[in-house]
Amino acid sequence: MIKQRTPKKVIQATGVGLHSGEKVLLTLRPAPVNTGIVFRRVDLSPVVEIPASYEYVGDTMLCTTLHHGKVKIATVEHLLSALAGLGIDNAYIDVNAPEIPIMDGSAAPFVFLIQSAGIREQNAAKRYIRILKPIRVEENGKYVQFLPHKGYKITFTIGFEHPVFNDRPQTVSFDFSGTSYVKEVCRARTFGFLSDYEKLRECDLAKGGSLDNAIVVDDYRVLNEDGLRFESEFVTHKVLDAIGDLYLLGSSLIGAFEGYKSGHELNNRLLRELMVRQDAWEYTYFDTENYLPAVHPEYYPVEA
């Protein structure tokens, strides 16, 4: 049986919020079986819980933001990506601010945090969503789609006519039956254009944004002194984002996802379209260790 997983112990990290620029304390806690991933605004009284579910997604302008009434938690996608990549099914995530810290702009610090906490298997079967029929959402020349597939595969294409992008890969495809999320995906940082950051600052946003937590591009070049971590870092970050957004289904996927110039909004619309098309998917479980159709097949050692 492929079992559910949770962090082994409580662990904390601090960072700055991308938009507020304020210090954020994040606490990762173990959770019982079938809890799912639950965010908790512990700076509020009473504490407000927001499940990591596509149904709670509100704003998708610059990141994925979860809403529960007037309470929100923004920039959840990188942490969710790390949780998905390490196969964590159940966890409480306490934050004392309305956004998850941006860290270095990738999911790698969250992967390190989870690995440091350790991972424990739980006595319940892990649930998967298997894609049975193609589902597609498109708008203004952009699209996202699910396709049936025996494992988990993500293909993404960006399309920037820009000197920095023209000489680098703008399409990548990862089949996670043979790809390591930790080694090949989680280190890809978020990116943006200097002109956009200047506009955001004028709107009192991105106050925590810097060259320490994003790749910044001007009209001709990458401004970060150390450059890119690898040549396909731009488009690979879009895969990282998609893995986090798709984990808002509340289960790991068995199927293929394709994104073409898409972002958080289309990703969420695809999840909503999938869930109302009940003939296009099914829940499934695995009672054998011989087949691990998950985001990250190289599961880290766990303790029961």
UniProtKB/Swiss-Prot annotation:
Swiss-Prot/TrEMBL keywords: Hydrolase, Lipid A biosynthesis, Lipid biosynthesis, Lipid metabolism, Metal-binding, Zinc
EC annotation from Swiss-Prot or TrEMBL: 3.5.1.108
General function of this protein: Catalyzes the hydrolysis of UDP-3-O-myristoyl-N-acetylglucosamine to form UDP-3-O-myristoylglucosamine and acetate, the committed step in lipid A biosynthesis.
Signal peptide range in chain numbering: none
Coiled-coil ranges per UniProt: none
Cofactor: Zn(2+)
One GO MF term attached to the UniProt entry: UDP-3-O-acyl-N-acetylglucosamine deacetylase activity
Residue numbers annotated as active site: H264
Pathway field: Glycolipid biosynthesis; lipid IV(A) biosynthesis; lipid IV(A) from (3R)-3-hydroxytetradecanoyl-[acyl-carrier-protein] and UDP-N-acetyl-alpha-D-glucosamine: step 2/6
Gene Ontology CC: membrane
Positions that bind Zn(2+): H78, H237, D241
Protein name as annotated: UDP-3-O-acyl-N-acetylglucosamine deacetylase
Reactions that this protein is recorded to catalyse: a UDP-3-O-[(3R)-3-hydroxyacyl]-N-acetyl-alpha-D-glucosamine + H2O = a UDP-3-O-[(3R)-3-hydroxyacyl]-alpha-D-glucosamine + acetate
Protein family per UniProt: Belongs to the LpxC family.
BP-aspect Gene Ontology terms: lipid A biosynthetic process
Domain of life of the source: Bacteria
InterPro entries: Ribosomal_Su5_D2-typ_SF (IPR020568), UDP-acyl_GlcNac_deAcase (IPR004463), UDP-acyl_GlcNac_deAcase_C (IPR011334), UDP-acyl_N-AcGlcN_deAcase_N (IPR015870)
